[in-house]
């Protein structure tokens, strides 16, 4: 029988499951090296935590790791139902809030090691969290793909910690009651990108699709299709970072100016950026709330103990 200690939270409605203990040892390498070990040798632990019957498609896991550097508060490896994530904005906010709950950190600035580099997270006195992300940049502008049933769709390819295709002119209604249609449209766009061979840098697959719309109260409202078939309930930290990179490249948002990004369900992140060589360094601010603390149990004779493959 296996036991995995977890603490759940949600950031703007998007859940994060922090794995505190119970995973196999991954060695003392970087977070990228440990991710490779986890994916290659112990992927069933990811599946057990995230897939049904213990998880769901919308859940993001965050394996809490000892950092390489003594100056870092923690290391983390993010994963979901489809595999592994280089970085996760909402997940980092959830992780920092969880570390505070565990008594590991107090308000202040903390460095978090991720597989794509270190991020700086500030826990504020009101327990909201600001995340200074990795470098974000636009890789390609005005990329056109033919989407069956929808015709030509134009968008930008950008990196914000994950690869995104960002579309503003899509003709879809970005609203909570329309998520089924939005997911179908975004899935069709992602499939069209794959057929056309459109990728991120060095052939990296584009696994996130982000649709933007005007919002009467905030700067924008977005729908984000994550890897697999789930959509982001939060405004998506890495997606907002990619959006800032595109706005900066187009001269539509100056450094230091706040951009307020709403999600499809109405939760909000505040974001700004600092100019940097080759792109921008975004800072995303949001809040997470604790929702559960539990021990997952995997019985030896459970036929679905290691998850139900979808």
UniProtKB/Swiss-Prot annotation:
Enzyme group, top EC level?
Answer: isomerase
What are the record keywords, sorted? Isomerase
Indicate how activity is controlled. Inhibited by iodoacetate, iodoacetamide and by high amounts (10 mM) of pyrrole-2-carboxylic acid (PYC). Not inhibited by PYC at 1 mM.
Where is coiled-coil annotated?
none
Q: Matching Pfam families, A to Z?
A: Pro_racemase
Identify which residues the record assigns to the active site: 88, 236
Q: Which SUPFAM superfamilies does the UniProt record give?
A: Diaminopimelate epimerase-like
Q: What biological function has been recorded for the protein in this entry?
A: Allows intracellular utilization of 4-hydroxyproline, one of the major constituents of host collagen, by converting 4-hydroxy-L-proline to 4-hydroxy-D-proline, which can be further metabolized by intracellular 4-hydroxy-D-proline oxidases.
Family from the record: Belongs to the proline racemase family.
What protein is this chain from? 4-hydroxyproline epimerase
């Amino acid at each position: 029988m296996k036991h995995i200690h977890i603490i759940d939270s949600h950031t703007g409605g998007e859940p994060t499951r922090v794995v505190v203990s119970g995973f196999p040892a991954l060695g003392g390498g970087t977070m990228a090296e440990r991710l490779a070990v986890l994916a290659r040798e112990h992927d069933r632990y990811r599946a057990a935590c995230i897939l049904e019957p213990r998880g769901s498609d919308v859940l993001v896991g965050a394996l809490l790791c000892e950092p390489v550097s003594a100056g870092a508060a923690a290391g983390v490896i993010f994963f979901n139902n489809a595999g592994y994530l280089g970085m996760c904005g909402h997940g980092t906010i959830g992780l920092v809030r969880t570390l505070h709950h565990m008594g590991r950190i107090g308000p202040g600035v903390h460095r978090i090691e991720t597989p794509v580099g270190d991020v700086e997270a500030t826990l504020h006195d009101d327990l909201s969290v600001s995340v200074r992300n990795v470098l974000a940049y636009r890789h390609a502008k005005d990329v056109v793909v033919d989407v069956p049933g929808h015709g030509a769709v134009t968008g930008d390819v950008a990196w914000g910690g994950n690869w995104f295709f960002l579309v503003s002119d899509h003709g879809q209604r970005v609203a909570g009651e329309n998520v089924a249609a939005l997911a179908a449209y975004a899935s069709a766009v992602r499939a069209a990108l794959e057929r056309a061979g459109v990728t991120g840098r060095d052939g990296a697959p584009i696994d996130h699709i982000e649709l933007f719309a005007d919002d009467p109260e905030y700067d924008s409202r977005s729908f984000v299709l994550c890897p697999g078939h789930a959509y982001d309930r939060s405004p998506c930290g890495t997606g907002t970072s990619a959006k800032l990179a595109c706005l900066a490249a187009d001269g539509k948002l100056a450094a230091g100016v706040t951009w307020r990004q709403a999600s499809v369900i109405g939760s909000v992140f505040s974001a700004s950026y600092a100019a940097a060589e080759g792109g921008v360094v975004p800072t995303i601010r949001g809040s997470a709330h604790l929702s559960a603390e539990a021990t997952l149990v995997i019985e030896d004779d459970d036929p679905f103990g290691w998850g139900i493959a979808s």
